C-alpha cells in the first residue's frame, strides 16, 4: 500500500470526522431550540393561569378574555414551531447516524490498510534478516 493512498485515507477520515462533529453540533443546537420552545410554552401557559383570577366588571372581563386569547395564539404558534423543530431534529439525527457510519467505514478501512502495511513491512524485514542469516551460514560453511 503506497504512502500516497494512506495519506488520502487519513485525509478522508479527517474530513468524515469533521462532518460528524458538525452534524453533532447541529443536532445539539436543534435540541436546544426544541427545549427553548418548550420553555416558552410553559412560561406562556403560566401567564394564562394569572388571567384566570376572577375579575370584576365587564371591561376587565373583556380585557382578560382578549389577553388569554392572544396568549393562547402565541402558545399555539410556539407549539407549531416546536413540532417543526422536532421534525428537523429527527432529520438531523438521521443525518448524524449516516455521518457516523460513513466515518466508521473509513476508519475501519484505514485501520485494515495500516495493519496490512505493518504485516508487509514485517515480511520485508524478515526477508532481510533471513538473507543475512543465509549469508552468514554460507560464509561459515565455506570458511
What are these regions (language model features)?
Residues 1-143:
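Charge-rich amphipathic alpha-helical interaction elements
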Amino acid at each position: 500500500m503506497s504512502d500516497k493512498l494512506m495519506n488520502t485515507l487519513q485525509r478522508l477520515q479527517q474530513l468524515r470526522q469533521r462532518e460528524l462533529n458538525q452534524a453533532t453540533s447541529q443536532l445539539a443546537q436543534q435540541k436546544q431550540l426544541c427545549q427553548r420552545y418548550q420553555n416558552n410554552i410553559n412560561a406562556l401557559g403560566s401567564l394564562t393561569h394569572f388571567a384566570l383570577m376572577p375579575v370584576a366588571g365587564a371591561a376587565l372581563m373583556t380585557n382578560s378574555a382578549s389577553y388569554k386569547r392572544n396568549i393562547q395564539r402565541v402558545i399555539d404558534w410556539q407549539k407549531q414551531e416546536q413540532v417543526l423543530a422536532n421534525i428537523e431534529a429527527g432529520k438531523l439525527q438521521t443525518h448524524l447516524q449516516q455521518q457516523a457510519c460513513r466515518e466508521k467505514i473509513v476508519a475501519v478501512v484505514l485501520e485494515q490498510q495500516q495493519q496490512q502495511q505493518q504485516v508487509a513491512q514485517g515480511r520485508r524485514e524478515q526477508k532481510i534478516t533471513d538473507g543475512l542469516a543465509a549469508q552468514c551460514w554460507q560464509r561459515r560453511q565455506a570458511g
